[in-house]
Every structure is written in structure tokens, then in C-alpha cells.
Amino acid sequence: MTTNDLRELFLDLNVKFDEELKKYTNTKTGGKADVLAFPDSIEETEKLIKIAKKNNVPLTILGNASNLIVKDGGIRGLVVILQHLDQITVDGTKVTAQAGASLIGTTRVAAKHSLTGMEFASGIPGSIGGAIFMNAGAYGGEIKNIVESVKLLTRDGEYKTYTVDELDFGYRHSRLQSEDDIVVAATFKLEHGDIKKIRERMEELSFLRASKQPLEYPSCGSVFKRPAGHFTGKLVYDSGLQGYTVGGVQVSKKHAGFIVNIGNGTGKDYLDVIHHVQAVVKEKFDVELETEVRIIGED
């Protein structure tokens, strides 16, 4: 399908054509999307998906483009970033957030209503949709422990709901990783708590994160899953890889579990660093480092 064909299909919608994705990814890398959309409502999202389905346009859904690496060749077809779907509501001890709402923002709303259970996520720079997709977690907490249900939109434009038991959560895993359904909202079951203690815990975790993680540089967060019996950062550090650099991408000198863009890094730079780290850790410790970050797009 030509660029002109795509323009005709999506002309009446609020989209961008041939847009550089590096403007929107947390790594500040990534080639062009043929069509890029930021829907303002679930209904608009549904319309975009139906157009793509009807016309066989490839479709890629992103939350807020945080825990992923987009390759330099970009992404063909339609890319939908859900960050404008950010409504958050509270009903008793239940918090419902749309897929594009930030985890940080959702934890703050929960805290404002003296609801506890979500503090662990207060420093995770991702969206609700992405957090469900990969069962995000930190500091001993995981999304699976607080989710009650998730509302999904199928590629056919139909809606369905999964309970937590139906999502097949595991370590950085959910069944959504092998399915095409799109998270549009999630409901969390929390508990009443002491607002002072909730905020103290959130401040404590924010301090820990700022003191240990390289927040001063663009990154995709934690790159590798934690292998059983090991700490990823220690394996990388003990392999002598801290500070290893390709182009503008570097294994962080502050935390060896992070890979950062120190200036004009590319998707290829990221992948070259990742593959080198995997190879060296495998050679030195016979441990396979599996990526946690989502890698998409064309070379």
C-alpha cells in the first residue's frame, strides 16, 4: 500500500504521516511510522483499528513507548500510541485506569484516596496497558497482585473482559503477549490505608530509584529479565561491561542493568550493545540473558 493510499484512508483522522518515532520513544531511537495516531477516546481507537482491519493495514499498538526499542527502519502501517487514553476513576477500593494512563499517575490517584497496594509501581515509567501486557513489577510487587479485571478491544473492534485468573500472569509475562487483543482499561482492587504511610513508602521508593538508576539519560528501563539465581546488574558488572559503548548507546556506569542513550544513539546501537552483553555473560557465566524490553520494527 502506497503512502497516498494510506493518506486517503486516514485523512479525516488526527494522524501524522512518515513520523519519526524517536520523538516519542523513551530511548529516543526509532525510524518512521507510515501512519502515527494518538486517539483521544476508546471510540476513536476502535475506528482506527477497524479501518486498519478492513484495509489490511499492519497495526502496532503502543502504550507510552517506554519499555521498547524501535528499530531504525521504523514500522510499516499504522502505529497507535494510547497515551491520551488516560482517564482514572475511583470507586471505593477499586481504581480503574485507561490503557494510556501512566503507572506513576495512577499510583498518585490511589494514594490521594488513601488506597494502598500500588506503591511499588510509583516509579515505573510505563503505561497501564504496557504494565498489564508484561506484568510489570518492582520492589517486591507485581501488577498481577492487584489487578481485578482488564477490558480488551479485539482487532475486529469487539470488546471483552478478562479476570486476573484468565490473564495467565507470570514473571514479566501475560497471555496478551501471544494474542492480538488490545488493553483499553484495567481495574485494580486495593485496600484502605494510612495516607501518610502510603506517601512515605512512595517517597522512599522514588529516592531508591533516583539514587540507583540512570534517570539522567534516555533509556527503556530494565533491559533483561532477572535469570533464576542471579542479579542481572551484577552479572553485567562482573563481566566488565559497565561503560561498554557502541555509538551513542552505553551500558550505564551508574547501574549495569540499564542501557542508556548518551547522545544520538540508534536502534542498531542498542541492539549491538544488547547482543554483546548477552554473548559475554553467556561466555563468562553460562547464563542466558533474556530481554525484557520489547523490540519492534524493521532494520
From Swiss-Prot:
Its cofactor is FAD. Residues 29-193 form the FAD-binding PCMH-type domain. It catalyses: UDP-N-acetyl-alpha-D-muramate + NADP(+) = UDP-N-acetyl-3-O-(1-carboxyvinyl)-alpha-D-glucosamine + NADPH + H(+). The keyword Cell wall biogenesis/degradation applies. GO terms for cellular component: cytosol. Keywords: Cell cycle, Cell division, Cell shape, Cell wall biogenesis/degradation, Cytoplasm, FAD, Flavoprotein, NADP, Oxidoreductase, Peptidoglycan synthesis. Its main location: cytoplasm. Belongs to the MurB family. HAMAP family: MurB (MF_00037). This is UDP-N-acetylenolpyruvoylglucosamine reductase. It comes from Ligilactobacillus salivarius (strain UCC118) (Lactobacillus salivarius).
